[in-house]
């Protein structure tokens, strides 16, 4: 059997395996269960390893498959799939991470009344992301894009009785709608100018207009929570912990970056678009890292770290290195999912407590969980030979050796330092010191569905970087020689961040609580972004609307143009007349003299 046909069959089999828990139970009158859905994803993961291995050893660059669905005689829906290094590598990674998260959710969400529905939503969420990944035309990509958006809305607002969860779900939907405007406008431009939505045909090497590219960047900004459209991502942690783990690791938030990776040949011919990505990513990564420094909610710190890493991926797109951005997506998925699962287990053990200031001494009561949390934080920092190092160090090396503006480089290095600071701060407050919140029940991490997924992801956080980086070939020759200071820049700034975190934590035990200053307020208030955008803008719009509705319609239209308008017209004429005819001799003599003077001047001319 030929390689393309074999790959096509096995990839389709993987997708069909995932669809069985959604399609078969209604058809055969069967009952679904969380365990059956988890086993389905495990099976799909094992199947997906076969086409990935075949593709890696085939030496092919990409294999495309095209079908047409004849919906009505004159209307065809193209279904085009692209099996390249990105989609073939992403399939097993996403399935492995989702399998671990769903196994954890069987324990974490055991008391939920609609747990099967919850698992079906998570499965649909994954299928939408895989559709987006394998799509070879903008139509199918848009289907996956919208599917991911709708499922995120349903999952973030899963606990509908909580006002914060409903607000966060609505916020995610609204911010993503803004991004969707950019994608729809870009698709409209492609359809009208190039008459195609096939990705191979739109990525021509000629100079591309900036407008459709800015639409794609706007779409990625909304979906991947870049600066300006970022507030929904930290708010999304109001959903259940398995949702946060899946959302932040391998599904929705990387969809925007994946869109730019897919359309990268279209993007790389326009320097304005690349510079926009670079500067936007640098600003996003620093802003999110700064906000994470003063947060006390464990899930919020991890959420801001996601936003910061997405900014780093956007910087990599701006450097014209899509393979490196994909490598960071792949390695990031393992340790970010693990961090969320560890935080979920800690929160569950401490009666729902999420404030890291109220935790402490957990390395004695939860040794395995805290060890995995430490591994995840070290991988996030870019500690040598863990998963994050292989992508993060390469990104900063390429950043240091590229001809780019120093502003973006400085912001990214500062954000890298801050990453070490907030990661170590979280580790110290959670694990060291004394117990600050006694648990109502004995803390236990011997439950296999709770601890096995975390251990699997910990293994991935250690091994994945080496494994994936050996399979993804760099698009350009990496810089072979560079000054020592350039090579060690990432390690130096990370070490500075660690020293800063240690100093701050040691001072916090001996000094009085610090007074609030503008810098601390800026970080803890999330850069004043939410009050400015979420309160002032709606307030101005509401007041303006009220004025337009009441004053203009009632007063201006009916009164000013009607009876009051007629009265005002006569009043103005009357005032002019009374001003001229005062009955005083001085006024008449003055008017007479002024008239004579004007007449003489006109005659002389």
UniProtKB/Swiss-Prot annotation:
Its EC number is 7.1.1.2. Its main location: mitochondrion. Core subunit of respiratory chain NADH dehydrogenase (Complex I) which is composed of 45 different subunits. The chain crosses the membrane at residues 10-30, 44-64, 88-108, 114-134, 139-159, 178-198, 213-233, 241-261, 273-293, 301-319, 332-352, 370-390, 404-424, 448-468, 489-509, 583-603. Keywords: Electron transport, Membrane, Mitochondrion, Mitochondrion inner membrane, NAD, Respiratory chain, Translocase, Transmembrane, Transmembrane helix, Transport, Ubiquinone. The keyword Endoplasmic reticulum does not apply. The lineage of its organism: Eukaryota, Metazoa, Chordata, Craniata, Vertebrata. InterPro entries: NADH_DH_su5_C, NADHpl_OxRdtase_5_subgr, ND/Mrp_TM, NU5C-like, Proton_antipo_N. One of its GO terms (biological process) is electron transport coupled proton transport. Core subunit of the mitochondrial membrane respiratory chain NADH dehydrogenase (Complex I) which catalyzes electron transfer from NADH through the respiratory chain, using ubiquinone as an electron acceptor. Essential for the catalytic activity and assembly of complex I. The keyword Mitochondrion applies. GO terms for cellular component: mitochondrial inner membrane; respiratory chain complex I. GO terms for molecular function: NADH dehydrogenase (ubiquinone) activity. It is found in: Mitochondrion inner membrane. It catalyses: a ubiquinone + NADH + 5 H(+)(in) = a ubiquinol + NAD(+) + 4 H(+)(out). Belongs to the complex I subunit 5 family. It comes from Gallus gallus. This is NADH-ubiquinone oxidoreductase chain 5. It is an enzyme of class 7 (translocase). It is a multi-pass membrane protein.
């Amino acid at each position: 059997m030929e390689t393309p046909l074999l790959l096509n069959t096995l990839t389709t089999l993987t997708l069909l395996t995932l669809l069985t828990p959604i399609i078969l139970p209604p058809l055969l009158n069967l009952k679904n269960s969380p365990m059956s859905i988890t086993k389905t994803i495990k099976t799909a993961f094992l199947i997906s390893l076969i086409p990935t291995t075949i593709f890696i050893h085939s030496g092919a660059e990409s294999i495309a498959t095209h079908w047409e669905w004849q919906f009505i005689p004159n209307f065809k829906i193209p279904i085009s799939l692209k099996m390249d290094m990105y989609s073939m590598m992403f399939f097993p990674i996403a399935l492995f991470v989702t399998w671990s998260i769903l196994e954890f959710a069987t324990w974490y969400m055991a008391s939920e009344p609609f747990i099967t529905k919850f698992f079906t939503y998570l499965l649909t969420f994954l299928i939408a992301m895989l559709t987006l990944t394998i799509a070879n035309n903008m139509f199918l990509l848009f289907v996956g894009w919208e599917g991911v958006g709708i499922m995120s809305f349903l999952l973030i607002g899963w606990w509908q009785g909580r006002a914060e969860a409903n607000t966060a779900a609505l916020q995610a939907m609204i911010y993503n709608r803004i991004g969707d405007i950019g994608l729809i406008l870009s698709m409209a431009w492609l359809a009208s100018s190039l008459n195609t939505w096939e990705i191979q045909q739109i990525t021509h090497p000629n100079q591309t207009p900036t407008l459709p590219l800015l639409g794609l960047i706007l779409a990625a900004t909304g979906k991947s929570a870049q600066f300006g459209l970022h507030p929904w991502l930290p708010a999304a942690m109001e959903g259940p912990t398995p949702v946060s783990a899946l959302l932040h690791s391998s599904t929705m938030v990387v969809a925007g970056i994946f869109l730019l990776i897919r359309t990268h040949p279209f993007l790389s011919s326009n320097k304005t678009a690349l510079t926009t990505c670079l500067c936007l990513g640098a600003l996003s990564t620093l802003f999110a890292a700064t906000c994470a420094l003063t947060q006390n909610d464990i899930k919020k710190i991890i959420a801001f770290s996601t936003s910061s890493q997405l900014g780093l991926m956007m910087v990599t797109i701006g450097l014209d290195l899509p393979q490196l951005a994909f490598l960071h997506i792949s390695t990031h998925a393992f340790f970010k999912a693990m961090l969320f699962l560890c935080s979920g287990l800690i929160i569950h053990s401490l009666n729902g407590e999420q404030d890291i200031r109220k935790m402490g001494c957990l390395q004695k009561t939860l040794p395995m969980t805290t060890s995995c949390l430490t591994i995840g934080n070290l991988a996030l920092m870019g500690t040598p030979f863990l998963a994050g190092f292989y992508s993060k160090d390469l990104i900063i090396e390429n950043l240091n050796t590229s001809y780019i503006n120093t502003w973006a480089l400085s912001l990214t290095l500062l954000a890298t330092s801050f990453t070490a600071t907030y990661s170590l701060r979280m580790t110290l407050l959670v694990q060291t010191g004394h117990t600050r919140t006694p648990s109502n029940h004995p803390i236990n991490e011997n439950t296999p569905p709770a601890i096995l997924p975390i251990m699997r992801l910990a293994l991935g956080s250690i091994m994945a970087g080496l494994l994936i980086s050996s399979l993804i070939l760099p698009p350009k020759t990496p810089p072979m020689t560079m000054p020592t200071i350039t090579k060690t820049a990432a390690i130096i700034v990370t070490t500075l961040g660690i020293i800063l975190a240690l100093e701050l934590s040691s001072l916090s035990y001996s000094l009085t609580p610090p007074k609030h200053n503008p810098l601390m307020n800026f970080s803890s208030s999330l850069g004043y972004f939410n009050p400015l955008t979420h309160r002032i803008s709606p307030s101005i719009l509401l007041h303006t609307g009220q004025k337009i509705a009441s004053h203009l319609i009632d007063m201006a239209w009916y009164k000013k143009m009607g009876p009051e308008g007629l009265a005002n017209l006569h009043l103005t004429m009357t005032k002019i007349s009374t001003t001229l005819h005062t009955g005083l001799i001085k006024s008449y003599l003055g008017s007479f003299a002024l008239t004579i003077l004007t007449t003489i001047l006109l005659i002389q001319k």
